[in-house]
Amino acid sequence: MLEPSDYELTHKWHTDYDIQKMTCGQFRFVSKEIEKNWATAKSTNNLREIYLAICAIDNDRMIGYISINEIDHIHRSCHCGGVVVGDKEYRNTREYVEAVSLVHDYVFNHLNMNRISGGCLVEHIMSRAEMEGFFYDLEGIEKEAIFKDGRYHDKRNYALMSKTYFAHKSNGDYEVGKTILRIAKNVKQLKYNK
């Protein structure tokens, strides 16, 4: 889980425009005190949302975080609020794929969710490639849903159902190497079709 002491790193990432420009959230300047309160709140409430640190395989250093939000135990659904890999050295690497895979395992095998949703800006090719690489289905596009950088952006909405997850899991489709290759192929195709 994210720890209150992680606020120094999350503050650095939350105030880095290059990291935040492709997220669906608004870019905001925040003080370290506000960030400290945010990290404390995220690390002490795990009923409706869970924030997990992503750590490097080689040295166990925190390189980012991933969140599970809108956890609904009645409807058995939740939302992947996003993945932030703040350390540029580790972007689009094995750590990212393993973090998402662990979240899927936790969501479907431990929280007993039936679906996990996710969304991204239409122009965020990497997020699209990743969600499709993990077999999320496109459920629709919200027109001009996100206001960012002085203009409105369309948002793609995806979902991964438990039956889809377990079918691909039993086929071995979520092996890290296969997933990385699928994502790379998707990126290439999306850039070509752009």
Where are these regions (language model features)?
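Hydrophobic pocket/interface hotspot
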Residues: T10-H11, I19, E35, C80
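Acyl-donor (CoA/ACP) binding surface of acyl/acetyltransferases
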Residues: M1-Y7, D58-K194
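Conserved GNAT-fold acetyl-CoA-binding loop/helix
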Residues: D18-A39
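A short helix-loop-beta-strand connector motif used in the catalytic cores of GNAT acetyltransferases and
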Residues: T40-A53
